[in-house]
A protein has these predicted regions:
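A glycine-rich phosphate-binding loop feature that marks nucleotide/adenosyl-phosphate handling sites
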Residues: 44-45, 63-65, 79-87, 199, ...
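Terminal amphipathic helices with adjacent charged low-complexity linkers/tails
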Residues: 77-110, 149, 339, 420-450, ...
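Catalytic alpha/beta core of large soluble enzyme barrels
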Residues: 124-150, 440-446, 489, 493-494, ...
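Gly/Pro-rich turn-and-neighbor structural signature
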Residues: 164-235, 375-405, 409-414, 544-604
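Internal maturation/activation junctions in enzymes
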Residues: 482-504, 508, 529-622, 693-694
Length: 760
């Protein structure tokens, strides 16, 4: 009966459906794949055909039929579905499967205003032809289905209203490289472009959403993370809100430091008025964050930071929970609570914590970040001064409230500000780190603005990327990859536009980069080691030592060629201090691996030539971009062998890499047991990583007799993280018993970092 059905062609003509042609396309897509059945895909699709069906609907039906068959037993359907999608998308973009010549493609899209016109000005036709001959369009067939759907939904240059798509993946990769290396000398730039194209299109380097979707278009803002500090004045609060709007509209995730704002009831103008407290201003920031969608890709998101000893802390800790009324809740932002050794020692010793308004205790707020001994002396002095207004709470009660809110919302984060400043690339006396970003992996200096155009203030930006550990055969491969990624991201800093002077000045002076990793869980499985039992400690130490060493080396080489960053003198590197000198020595008790690289020679080179970049590493979450590389997310263990991600492009199934061979080696999140092994690994990584790490804590209430996670356990893990030098804690995940056991882990999309922000 199917023979009689008609199909409506793209040009509107009707003809009899050609099942043989459909068979040929599916057979082509199945070539070389393991355990997939062409006839099963055909059968599943045929049932859904109807008379007059359009060519597009036929294609989409076949793709969906293949995607529905993805499972643990038959993981290769993810490649069959992907190849069918690639075929379909190329037809949509080019009218045929074969891509056009690169030069013609770029000329057309520049003419349409979709690509940046500098591409036609910077490169000759002959150069485009040389690059075109180098492109390998067959690499499109290495994507998984989840990757193609992400490319289609988020990354390809398109008209988001009419859903027209204008390009395919290999053009995306080569043009990102061409934009970044456009100002390099003609004699070397094509070589860099080809090498960077190879590294990114074979998934060795993973690029963040803002770069993948934005570089080659006329909108030039690609920093994933923006850190804005607010002062304790109305002018500064207004400047902060305006800065938020400016950056949220350009695809960035925001970290806001609101810790200086004075507490409720504090005096204003010597008592002429009393202060309304933090909450009305947090609401103002929330409105600013939510007023724009991020470049049409997703809604804005922010994390707000404040110290545990802030006078209003008990009202601030509950802002996200579901109790309370609209007036005393600000639920649509996340919060980062700042701690240090003095706060922890009050907890351990069963003491009290005194809460102050920062405006009542001169010098205390700055000392909290700049100098721990000075902070403690001032804190005790103010506690003993009866003229200073304060509230006293039992440390255990305050910490319990903090951990209870972290557990119930999952989104109250932790920043250990002493670790962020003692084990930092920056000299804390001149450039203290006073906040983090949306996802807690960035630790950069900021200064409050007095108005939006103020260039005395400092807005920190971080430009991200990651190494795919699963695609690296030996650690020395990192030497070339580090050179490529440092050169590309450093060039990006000069290539992009800066909406605000405070951001431009800070970035030009510090030139901060954050290179992380993806596919760590696959890397452990491939090497036969686990999160939980310490077997991965040595490998992790060797790997992260190599990453930091090669990135620093690449930045020194670039400094020799293009000069050190102007604020190099504000770094600890300028004093000859390296991460291996300042890390928390407690970590040596869980990992005895020696250093394998020549750090002393590197130290001398840095002292002599400086660094091009003040920071080089940050370990970010990578939900979206790890799907492109078919990798596991960041440093996280997978929740299931098949993850089912709900996104606006429908349900995406993704199977962990090399599942059939490594099934027994993967350790799933809820099989790990305690957080100890994971936190030890994060501590080992943090020894080398110069910024911070988005590290999560995970709890399964069903393993405890009461069915609840004891407070004692939550506090123990918090102290373990502190002990081993962990700078920040991101999500608190609680197992809710949803489908995890069946190997399929269903993940709902997150409203914040989903798709970029300061994830990659």
């Amino acid at each position: 009966m199917n023979q009689q059905l008609t199909v409506t062609k793209r040009n509107g003509r009707k003809e009899t459906i050609d099942l043989e042609k459909i068979h040929r396309v599916i057979t082509w897509a199945a070539e070389g794949l393991h355990n997939v059945s062409v006839s099963q895909v055909e059968l599943k699709a045929h049932i859904q055909f109807y008379d007059g069906i359009t060519t597009t609907d036929i294609h989409e039906t076949i793709i969906k039929s293949a995607a529905d068959l993805i499972s643990e037993e038959t993981p290769d359907y993810q490649y069959l579905a992907a190849r069918l999608s690639v075929f379909h998308l190329r037809k949509k973009a080019y009218g045929e499967y074969e891509p056009p010549a690169l030069y013609d493609h770029v000329a057309k899209l520049v003419d349409m205003g979709k690509y940046d016109s500098h591409l036609m000005e910077d490169y000759t036709k002959a150069e485009f032809e040389e690059l075109d001959a180098y492109i390998d369009h067959k690499r499109d067939l290495n994507f998984s289905y989840a990757a193609v759907k992400q490319l289609e939904g988020k990354y390809f240059v398109q008209n988001r209203v009419t859903k027209e798509i204008y390009e395919s993946a290999q053009f995306l990769y080569i043009l990102v490289a061409a934009c970044l290396f456009g100002k390099y000398p003609k004699s070397t730039r094509l070589d860099y472009i080809k090498r960077f194209y190879d590294a990114s299109s074979t998934f060795k380097i993973s690029l963040p959403t803002p770069i993948m979707s934005g570089v080659r278009t006329p909108t030039r803002q690609f920093s994933s993370c923006v850190l804005i500090e607010c002062g304790d004045s109305l002018d500064s609060i207004n400047a902060t809100a305006s800065s938020i709007v400016r950056y949220v509209s350009q695809r960035a995730g925001i970290g806001i430091n609101a810790g200086r704002i004075r507490a409720l009831g504090s005096e204003i103008r010597n008592g002429e008025a009393f202060h309304t407290g933090c909450i009305p201003f947090y609401k103002y920031f929330q409105t600013a964050v939510k007023c724009c969608s991020q470049g049409g890709v997703r809604g804005g998101a922010a994390t707000v930071f404040y110290p545990l000893w802030h006078g209003e802390v008990q009202s601030l800790l509950v802002l996200k929970n579901n109790r309370g009324v609209e007036e005393n809740r600000v639920r649509h932002m996340d919060y980062g609570v700042q701690l240090n050794k003095l706060m922890y020692s009050r907890l351990v010793q069963g003491g009290n914590i005194s809460l102050f308004s920062p405006s009542d205790v001169p010098g205390l707020y700055d000392a909290f970040f700049e100098n721990q001994e000075r902070f403690e002396a001032l804190y005790v002095k103010y506690e003993n001064d009866p003229s200073v207004k304060r509230e006293t709470v039992k440390a255990v009660e305050l910490f319990s409230l903090l951990m209870q809110e972290r557990a119930s919302t999952g989104r109250i984060y932790i920043q250990n500000v002493d670790h962020c400043n003692t084990h930092s690339p920056f000299d804390s006396e001149v450039a203290p780190v006073r906040q983090s970003n949306l996802c807690l992996e960035i630790a950069l200096p900021t200064k409050p603005l007095s108005n939006v155009e103020d260039d005395e203030g400092e807005i920190a930006l971080c430009t991200l990327s990651a190494f795919n550990l699963g695609a690296i055969n030996e650690l020395d491969d990192l030497a070339e990859l580090s050179e490529l990624v440092v050169r590309a991201l450093d060039a990006l800093l000069d290539y992009q536009d800066y909406p605000l002077p405070a951001a431009r000045k800070s970035t030009m002076n510090r030139r901060t980069l954050g290179v992380g990793v993806i596919n760590y869980a696959y890397y452990l499985a491939k090497n036969g080691v686990k999160y939980s039992d310490g077997s991965a400690n040595g490998l992790t130490h060797r790997t992260f030592e190599a990453i930091q060493y090669h990135l620093l080396k690449a930045s020194v080489e670039l400094a020799k060629e293009q000069g050190r960053c102007p604020s190099f003198h504000e770094t600890n590197y300028a004093k000859g201090l390296l991460p291996i000198d300042t890390y928390k020595k407690d970590i040596d008790s869980v990992c005895e691996e020696p250093l394998h690289y020549d750090w002393d020679t590197l130290r001398e080179e840095i002292m002599e030539h400086g660094l091009r970049n003040s920071t080089l590493t940050a370990l970010m979450p990578s939900e979206t971009s790890s799907q492109i590389s078919n990798a596991t997310n960041g440093i996280e263990p997978p929740r299931g062998y098949v993850s089912v991600k709900a996104s606006k492009d429908g349900i995406l199934k993704q199977v962990v890499p090399d599942f059939l061979n490594l099934k027994d080696n993967y350790e799933l999140l809820w099989n790990i047991g305690t957080n100890d092994g994971y936190l030890h690994l994060v501590g080992i990584m943090q020894k080398f990583v110069d910024q911070a790490i988005s590290a999560n804590t995970n709890y399964d209430p069903s393993v405890y007799d009461s069915g609840k996670v004891p407070m004692k356990q939550l506090l123990k893990d918090l102290l373990t993280a502190y002990k081993y030098g962990v700078k920040t804690l991101y999500y608190h995940n609680t197992r809710d018993g949803a489908k995890d056991d069946q190997g399929d882990a269903v993940q709902v999309p997150e409203e914040d970092c989903e798709g970029g922000g300061c994830k990659i």
